[in-house]
Amino acid sequence: MNTKVDIDSLPDFDAAQYLGDEATIAAYLTDILQANDAGLLAAALGDIARARGMSSIAESAGITREALYKALRADSAPRFDTVNKVCTALGVRLVVEPIAA
C-alpha cells in the first residue's frame, strides 16, 4: 500500500536545532564552503547564530540584531568583513588550503 504524504503537513527543517557543538558546526561550515555560494554561507552562518543565540552573536560581532538577520539571509551576499565579524563571534575561522590538483 502506498501512502501519500502531504509535504505541507511536514514540519520545516531547521538546521539550528542540530548545531549543538563545535565539531558539528565546523563540519557544517566546511561542507557549505565547498559549495562556493555566498548566499548559502550567509544562511549557514545564520543557522549557527540562531543556534547560539542571535542577540549575543550580534552583540559580540558589534552589529545590531536586525542587521545580523539581514546580512545572514539566504538571498544576501554579505561583505567579507561582516562574515569575518560573525565567524569571530561564533568562535570559528575560515581556513585557506591548497586546491588539490
Language-model regions, residue ranges each:
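Short alpha-helical DNA-recognition segment
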Residues: 50-70
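N-terminal flexible/basic segments that precede or flank functional cores
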Residues: 1-44
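Extended, folded domain segments that form the structural surfaces/walls around functional sites
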Residues: 27-28, 33, 68-70, 78
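Short C-terminal boundary/hinge segments that cap the last helix of small helical domains
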Residues: 91-101
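Alpha-solenoid HEAT/Armadillo repeat architecture
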Residues: 18, 34, 50, 73-76
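Short, basic-rich loop-to-helix N-cap that marks the start of a DNA-contacting helix
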Residues: 75-88
